Every structure is written in C-alpha cells, then in structure tokens.
Amino acid sequence: MIKPIKIGIGGPVGAGKTMLVEKLTKHLNTDYEIAAITNDIYTKEDAKILLKTGVLPEDRIIGVETGGCPHTAIREDASMNFEAIEELMIRHNNLDIIFIESGGDNLAATFSPELVDFSIYIIDVAQGEKIPRKGGQGMIKSDVFVINKTDLAPYVGADLGVMEQDTKHYRHNKPYFFTNLKDEEGLQELINWMRQNIMLEGLKK
C-alpha cells in the first residue's frame, strides 16, 4: 500500500481553505491520486461544498465533526482524523495525497506533525493588513503561507506591500504566496512550489 503525503490546510473561517483544496485538487489530480478530509465543528458543510465542486467523487471525501474545539482535532487529539485517513486508505490503496482541511480557527492553530507531513496556512486580505503582523503560530510555523483574496485589497484599505513586509519579518525565508483563488491568480506559482518541494518532481526520473 502506498503511503500518501498528508497536507494540512488551516486558517480562519472564510479565508478560502475549502476553495484552496478544490483548486489544488483540480490542477493536481491529473497526475496524482487525491482524497480529502474536512473538519467542521458541528456539521459536514465543507465536505458537501467540496463534493459539489465535482473535483473528487464522494468516496474520496470524508467530513469530520470535531465538536467545540477544531484545533484540538488537528493537534492534541487527532484521533478522528487518523481514523478518516485510515478509512480513505482502505477505500483507495493508491492515494498519493490526502488534504486535511481544519475547521476555521484562530491564528494560533497548528497541525500535529504526526498528522500531516506538510502544512499550508491561509488568511484573506479582508481580515485586515495587520494579520501577518500579529505573528500567529499558524502563519509562522506552516510550511507555506497563503494570503488570499488580493482583489479585495483596494476595497478594505489593505496594503499588500505592508502585508508582504510583515510576512517576511516573521517567516524569514519560508515561502509565501499572494492569491486570488476565485480567479486562480497566484495559484500556479503555489502549485509549482508544491510539485517541486512536496511531490519532489524535480528529483523523479
């Protein structure tokens, strides 16, 4: 049985986590076998949304209801997510990638290193240009940081240059990307990075 690469996607409510899973799957599933796990507090709404996009069939999506503390389900007690991973691997023994989307949470939420191999943390511009300056652990410790909805910057008075400067201050040389996922702006750069650094395509012969 192939051991899939597990990629965690975290971020606040409304930042674009589910859309990021959708877009990444859409562009990667021609080359890789993919499944997804979504975490919601009391519903399986994100799993339903992902299913409606058509990028994955129903048997490749599992919705996890985490209860009151979504960060606990991806870090302190990730048992429900481990069970979902096991179930997906039983259903499909050839998976290359499993995306694990966290429930919407605060800037301090991080994934257990036992649960995921890589993590992506996403915020959106509409939350304010000061968000990177707050230096939450999700932003600092994630392997990749995504600032989404750049198209909204003029409408909310956010300076992307300031956001980039603050991001560099906290992340140093760790990668970050500006995106407008709705129109797929900046998406290809993120995918290229993932192909090279997560899927190690450049090392494959």
From Swiss-Prot:
Q: Which CDD domains match?
A: UreG (cd05540)
**Positions bound to GTP:** G11, P12, V13, G14, A15, G16, K17, T18
Specify one Pfam family: cobW
Subunit organization: Homodimer. UreD, UreF and UreG form a complex that acts as a GTP-hydrolysis-dependent molecular chaperone, activating the urease apoprotein by helping to assemble the nickel containing metallocenter of UreC. The UreE protein probably delivers the nickel.
Q: Which HAMAP family match?
A: UreG
Q: What does this protein do?
A: Facilitates the functional incorporation of the urease nickel metallocenter. This process requires GTP hydrolysis, probably effectuated by UreG.
Q: Which family does it belong to?
A: Belongs to the SIMIBI class G3E GTPase family. UreG subfamily.
The name on file for this protein is: Urease accessory protein UreG
Source species of the chain: Bacillus cereus (strain ATCC 10987 / NRS 248)
Primary gene name: ureG
